Amino acid sequence: MESLFTGRIGLVIHLAALLSSAGEQHPDLAWRINADATWNLMRQAMSHAEAHGHTVRFVYPSSIAVHGRNASQSHPLLEDEAIAPRTLYGVTKRAMEQAGTWLSEECGRMLGQETGAAFDFRTIRYPGLLSAETLPTGGTSDYAPEMVHAAVRGEKASCFVPPHAQLPFMTMPEAAEATLALASAPRSCLQQNVYAVGGFAPTVAELENALRDRFPNFEVDYDPHPFRSEIVDSWPADVDDSAAQRDWGFQRGLDLGSALDDYLIPGIRNAHSQSKYECEETPRTL
């Protein structure tokens, strides 16, 4: 891991993780990737800051999975409300939020006193993410992108949560933009280390109806998985991102309709047509 820190590194964005459902199936691997590797990377970043006498900003993407029990309340949740993760993924995300904050506030301050260096830790807590280019695997919020991709491809969707289930979502480009905005914000503007961001928060039934408005023949086969449904029910139906708006100018962008019409549907169609073209153009070998 030391080889990652060559030259003078000022910003680390640590995206690697084993997601919620996959983490429940492979807990030891989830801990090694989500906790041990993250801790080691943070320590290396701090050592790099000390060695070069400058500040390293460490941006850590976290998740609504840190919330739990009674999180599905009628009001959008603040960052410190209903923290009781139901999954090991959520446990590791919360642990690293706290570990990074500790390093930033305690060890980082010690480095600064001695060398002028600092470890500047920032967390962006994502909702569910929707990508037009790839289908996610191993996440509990996967039902939404699976439904969208199936509708665009003219396929019947299978949904592992009931119609009333509800989670907040944002598109992948919006998540990337928000991450870079937090990364570039002056430290003096940040009043906390952990920031929630949100987008739109449809129920599964609302997502199904929006897709059927655009694809009249779209069908969904509901086959709720008890454990995955339980996880979704433990997460917030929406989040309060007023702190991100206040401190670094975050603004919610697309609603469900515009996310479908302006990004997801055309993007999935384009990716699907390219994939089909590549398959047709690939020469067959015997």
Identify the residue ranges that each predicted region occupies.
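The catalytic Tyr-centered alpha-helix of NAD(P)H-dependent dehydrogenases
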Residues: 74, 81, 85-92, 136, ...
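Hydrophobic positions on the long internal alpha-helix
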Residues: 37, 41-45, 99-100, 178, ...
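NAD(P)H-binding glycine-rich loop region in Rossmannoid oxidoreductase-like domains
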Residues: 1-33
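A conserved pocket-lining segment of Rossmann-fold NAD(P)-dependent short-chain dehydrogenase/reductase
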Residues: 23-24, 82, 125-138, 146-170
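C-terminal substrate-binding subdomain of Rossmann-fold SDR/epimerase-dehydratase oxidoreductases
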Residues: 155, 160-162, 168-286
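Conserved Rossmann-fold NAD(P)-dependent oxidoreductase catalytic core, especially the SDR/UDP-sugar
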Residues: 12-14, 39-88
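Glycine-rich NAD(P)-binding loop of the Rossmann-fold in SDR/ketoreductase-type enzymes
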Residues: 11, 25, 29-40, 83, ...
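Active-site Tyr-X1-5-Lys
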Residues: 47, 71-72, 84-122, 152
